[in-house]
Amino acid sequence: MFKIFVKINAIKNISAILIFSLLLLSCEDNDSSIKEIVNSDVEWQFTNIDDSVLDLELLKSNLSELIDSNYLRAIAISYNDQLIFDHYKIGDADKRYPVYSVTKSVLSAAFGKLFDQELIENENMTIDAFLNMYDYNDPEIKSTISVKHLLSMQSGIQDDVNYIRSDTPIKYILDQNLLYAPGRFWNYSSAGTHILSAVFQKITNENPESFVKKHIFDPLEITNYFWEVDANGLSNGGWGLYLTLHDMIKFGMLFSNDGKWNSDQLISQSWVNRSTSKMRAFRSGSGSWEYLPDNEAGYGYLWWINTVGDNEVFSALGYGGQYIVVDKTRKLVLAITSKESSSISYRRKISSIVFNDLIPIFPAAPPSNN
């Protein structure tokens, strides 16, 4: 059985940054009141692990580099399904943190549940099966956009985050010209994932937030969360989710265990494997790829994938330095939340420490009966 723990102790451009900042200030219940009161004292207490398993002094040394940063809010690590460390530099165990594009990976999990329940036939279904494309400009080409294109960031939809300020956000997005024919190139687009949210609602007659609550969050006992909506009340598919640090860990643990939580298969193993497999490969480590180390990275279905040693590791990543990193071989999950104002150098430091220093010191987890 998993130990459910309570321990008391778009990555894009300047315009996107401004929009995100406005959202933080304007949303009714967005936790913009996060108090920037810094806790500089670190209690170096590692639980559920000892020196016979891991060099704890080396772990402490690597963690210290992150914790000393002015941008870090909180960090937690679980190993072999148990929390071994957490630290709150800003906030506490009850604080909901904005996780930005980590939201996309949660939406991906929700789509996995749709496929598991056979509510959608396959990923190649085009969005004109769910949305009347003749309500928008250039319906012929946009009718060829598939669910797979949207899940893998290959739809050609522009990454214009101003949709969240529109009274008609879906029309705002789909009236714009495509950057390229669907399926031709990879291009990160929060607007595209908001179209996914609209497709999801059409399939289920339910807001993604409500569906996720019933089928994923409730079984994980995730109750202290918030999900922003657009002008029409639709869950924002691009960003907008707020989670506690431990709930970020829980979501990662669900995927580290192939979609299983306790005795319940919440999401099929086949979807976990498919959604965290590379649909597109590209070189990271420069420009906007400061969130991942400088190696051959890739993108799955709203998950980022890169290699650590011989293992593929996948991550839910959010603007400013929000991370849920999962290494299934090690049964290792790291959750990191950072200030939105974090610098590129800070995010590159996270990338280097997490993927080059922290993860490799953990051994593969022993076989589990869970």
Task: Tell what function each PLM region has.
Residues 23-26:
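C-terminal motif of bacterial Sec signal peptides marking the signal peptidase cleavage site
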Residues 28-30:
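Bacterial signal peptide processing site
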Residues 62-92, 324-325, 331-335:
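A short, well-structured edge-of-sheet supersecondary motif
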Residues 81, 97-123, 150, 196-200, ...:
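Active-site SXXK
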Residues 117-153, 175, 204-239:
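Active-site helix/loop module of the DD-peptidase/beta-lactamase fold
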Residues 134-163, 181-182, 191-192, 243-246:
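Conserved catalytic neighborhood of penicillin-recognizing serine enzymes
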Residues 195-199, 239-260, 322-338:
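Active-site-proximal alpha-helical segments within enzyme catalytic domains
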Residues 222, 276-333:
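Active-site Gly/Thr loop motif
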